[in-house]
């Protein structure tokens, strides 16, 4: 998606562009407007992709990325594949489901062809699944959520499906029978948990999450995990073994003194990424990739949740080829490019 006005990049690409540049006022050039879809506020994809947009908008004058933080990633990838949007969050798991026309893509006949139109700009750790409860709730394990109001993730999204499967794998609980899955978006769910209107709040995010850190300042919280005796079961291993997923650890002290966990919590870790359409301009993607990692390095210790967002992580768990512009940028940044990242 681009602005139909004359852009600096497009103008300079014309025969007369360079010669006429001095004769035109600066205001004659319009930025190229680009749409990027991500998850709601409080999620790590929102934080990372907001940072991406801010860095690009500040450092590359030819472009302006406008964020859309509504809807599910499963819808966003279809929009990008169809050329209706420019960038979105996706994941190795979503790519596998599209190829196999499975789960939320089961009724979308063109999904296997549409995934071929997507290209990876970069991957990054989404973080670990936080399953949060208040200390005052008395809940200390997943098998104690029966009858509770639970936010799994937005309906129809990958997070919702993952948590629904995890609760069944660990405790045998069925949504709608053993607990109530509250249907909310990310923003509304964070507010509902903060207001005490949810018993259990699930959010895949890098630790420490700003949203949960804010809650932990004035409230005792606990994070529920996968018990050791359940980790090696077939049902849990099917979750852990999905593309982009792994068993991961949420440290006991990640949220300070008000985190009640006395030991580290075993949960699910997940890799996600930013994808574009295969037809996105190569030089544009190259410039954006280089500018983003330069901006992340400049942020340093001021943004601790960005520490895991590195050039090396850009190809972690990758199962969708890199866009040629990203491939060029990451190669220049010294990243060892796996075969799966090459078209």
Label every PLM stretch briefly.
Residues 224-287, 337-341:
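C-terminal lobe and pocket-closing loops
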Residues 34-59, 63-66, 127-195, 302, ...:
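Bilobed "Venus flytrap"/periplasmic-binding protein-like clamshell domains
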Residues 293-310:
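Periplasmic-binding protein-like
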Residues 164-235:
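Ligand/cofactor pocket segment of small-molecule handling proteins
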Residues 109-124, 255-265:
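A structural signal for short loop-to-beta-strand junctions that line the ligand-binding cleft
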């Amino acid at each position: 998606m681009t602005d139909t006005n004359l852009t600096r990049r497009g103008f300079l690409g014309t025969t007369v562009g360079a010669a006429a540049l001095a004769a035109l006022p600066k205001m004659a050039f319009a930025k190229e407007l680009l749409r990027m879809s991500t998850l709601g506020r409080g999620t790590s994809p929102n934080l990372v992709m907001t940072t991406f947009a801010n860095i690009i908008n500040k450092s590359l004058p030819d472009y302006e990325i406008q964020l859309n933080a509504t809807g599910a990633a499963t819808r966003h990838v279809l929009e990008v594949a169809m050329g209706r949007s420019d960038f979105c969050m996706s994941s190795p798991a979503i790519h596998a489901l599209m190829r196999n026309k499975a789960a939320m893509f089961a009724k979308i006949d063109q999904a296997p062809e549409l995934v071929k139109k997507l290209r990876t700009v970069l991957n990054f750790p989404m973080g670990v699944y936080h399953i949060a409860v208040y200390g005052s709730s008395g809940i200390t394990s997943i098998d104690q959520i029966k009858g509770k109001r639970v936010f799994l993730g937005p309906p129809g999204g990958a997070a919702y499906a993952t948590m629904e499967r995890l609760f069944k794998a660990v405790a045998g609980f069925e949504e709608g029978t053993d607990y109530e899955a509250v249907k909310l978006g990310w923003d509304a769910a964070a507010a509902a948990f903060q207001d005490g209107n949810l018993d259990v709040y699930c959010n895949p995010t890098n630790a420490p999450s700003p949203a949960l850190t804010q809650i932990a300042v004035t409230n005792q919280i606990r994070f529920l995990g996968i018990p050791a005796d359940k980790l090696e079961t077939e049902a849990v291993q099917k979750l852990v073994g999905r593309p982009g997923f792994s068993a991961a650890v949420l440290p006991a002290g990640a949220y300070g003194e008000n985190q009640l966990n006395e030991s580290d919590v075993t949960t699910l870790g997940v890799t996600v990424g930013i994808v574009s359409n295969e037809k996105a301009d190569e030089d544009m993607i190259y410039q954006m990739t280089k500018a983003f990692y330069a901006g992340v390095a400049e942020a340093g210790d001021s943004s601790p949740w960005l520490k895991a967002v590195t050039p090396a992580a850009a190809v972690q768990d990758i199962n969708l080829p890199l866009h040629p512009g990203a491939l060029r940028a990451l190669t220049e940044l010294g990243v060892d490019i796996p075969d799966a990242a090459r078209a």
